[in-house]
């Protein structure tokens, strides 16, 4: 049994095996109806709990479909359905759920909730997102890059805007998959030093460049994410927009990257803010392949968690 809690907590060889398996599973499904079962059914007769303290489209649908394609069933639980950390301890919730289900995926705010769930659960726990990390997304991103351009090792990735939880997982992935990462954004939105330090210790070149044009020069992949959260107050949104506007990914900025550079965004996007529709719908963009690959990457993650 394995937990999938973060990129840096998983062996690099296991991460590589998951990416390779995800690609093979995707190829095996080409041309099949979405509800058709996979040839192999590693989740047959298995029940997976999908816990959402934060709203979700891609995470919920991709995990639900993936479990069903591999022969399992899902139980979707929201914060309103549970007493997670309110009235009942997370430890007790983890112990109880372990008696009912074979695997737990949790999308939560506080990373400590994920850690405690994994500590006390007797079944695999998967990090569907926390305020500090989003490893499933980055596995999909690596898969997407490699199916379009080949191995990501040695490539230059540029992250624009806010050094948020997705950026943090990208830095972990830089260390584990051997690519370099340049962050371009205002100083107050820099990634945490521990994430950059991990990648540097692994031999990746991690650079902070305030000038977005200089940052994307020679880039193989340019990545953007939303500048604001649904929970931000209006005044905070306006302030963030003013600070981050110079880091918008538009056609002019992409012209400074390599001619065959890819553009990614984990979605949902605020079009014309962090990136323009011209870029998002243009020839560099692979955002919808990226969204689809959440399904395939997570199926490989679930198989790994169960040793299947």
Curated annotation (Swiss-Prot):
Organism placement in taxonomy: Bacteria, Pseudomonadati, Pseudomonadota, Alphaproteobacteria, Rhodobacterales
Residues where carbamoyl phosphate binds: 56-59, 83, 107, 134-137, 266-267, 294
Any one of the GO BP annotations: arginine biosynthetic process via ornithine
GO cellular component: cytoplasm
Family matches, as InterPro entries: Asp/Orn_carbamoyltranf_P-bd (IPR006132), Asp/Orn_carbamoylTrfase (IPR006130), Asp/Orn_carbamoylTrfase_sf (IPR036901), Asp_carbamoyltransf_Asp/Orn-bd (IPR006131), Orn/put_carbamltrans (IPR002292), OTCase_ArgI (IPR024904)
Gene name per UniProt: argF
Coiled coil regions, renumbered to chain: none
Catalytic activity, as annotated: carbamoyl phosphate + L-ornithine = L-citrulline + phosphate + H(+)
PANTHER family noted in UniProt: ORNITHINE CARBAMOYLTRANSFERASE, MITOCHONDRIAL, ORNITHINE TRANSCARBAMYLASE, MITOCHONDRIAL
Alphabetical UniProt keywords: Amino-acid biosynthesis, Arginine biosynthesis, Cytoplasm, Transferase
Gene3D superfamilies xref list: Aspartate/ornithine carbamoyltransferase
Binding site for L-ornithine: 165, 225, 229-230
Function: Reversibly catalyzes the transfer of the carbamoyl group from carbamoyl phosphate (CP) to the N(epsilon) atom of ornithine (ORN) to produce L-citrulline.
Pathway connected to this protein: Amino-acid biosynthesis; L-arginine biosynthesis; L-arginine from L-ornithine and carbamoyl phosphate: step 1/3
Entry similarity comment: Belongs to the aspartate/ornithine carbamoyltransferase superfamily. OTCase family.
GO terms of molecular function: amino acid binding; ornithine carbamoyltransferase activity
Localization per record: Cytoplasm
Name of this protein: Ornithine carbamoyltransferase
Enzyme Commission designation: 2.1.3.3
């Amino acid at each position: 049994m394995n937990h999938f809690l973060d990129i840096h907590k998983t062996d690099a060889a296991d991460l590589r095996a998951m990416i390779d398996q995800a690609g093979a599973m995707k190829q095996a499904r080409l041309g099949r109806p979405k509800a058709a079962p996979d040839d192999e059914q590693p989740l047959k007769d298995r029940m997976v709990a999908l816990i959402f303290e934060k709203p979700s489209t891609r995470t919920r649908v991709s995990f639900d479909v993936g479990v069903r394609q591999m022969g399992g069933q899902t139980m979707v639980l929201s914060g309103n359905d549970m007493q997670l950390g309110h009235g009942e301890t997370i430890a007790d919730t983890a112990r109880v759920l372990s008696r009912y289900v074979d695997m737990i995926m949790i999308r939560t705010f506080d990373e400590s909730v994920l850690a405690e769930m994994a500590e006390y659960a007797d079944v695999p726990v998967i990090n569907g997102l926390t305020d500090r990390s989003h490893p499933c997304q980055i596995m999909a991103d690596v898969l997407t890059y490699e199916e379009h351009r080949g191995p990501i090792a040695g490539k230059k990735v540029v992250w624009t805007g806010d050094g948020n939880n997705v950026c943090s997982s990208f830095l972990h992935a830089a260390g584990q998959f051997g690519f370099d990462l340049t962050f371009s954004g205002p100083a107050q939105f820099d990634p945490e030093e521990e994430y950059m330090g991990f990648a540097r210790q692994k031999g990746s070149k991690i650079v902070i460049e305030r000038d977005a044009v200089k940052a994307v020069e020679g880039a193989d992949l340019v990545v953007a994410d939303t500048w604001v959260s649904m929970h931000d107050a209006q005044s905070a949104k306006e302030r963030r927009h003013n600070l981050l506007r110079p880091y918008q990914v538009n056609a002019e900025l992409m012209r400074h990257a390599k001619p065959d550079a890819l553009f990614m965004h984990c979605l949902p996007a605020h079009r014309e803010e962090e990136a323009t529709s011209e870029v998002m719908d243009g020839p560099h963009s692979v955002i919808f392949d990226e969204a689809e690959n959440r399904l395939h990457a997570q199926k490989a993650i679930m198989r790994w968690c169960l040793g299947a």
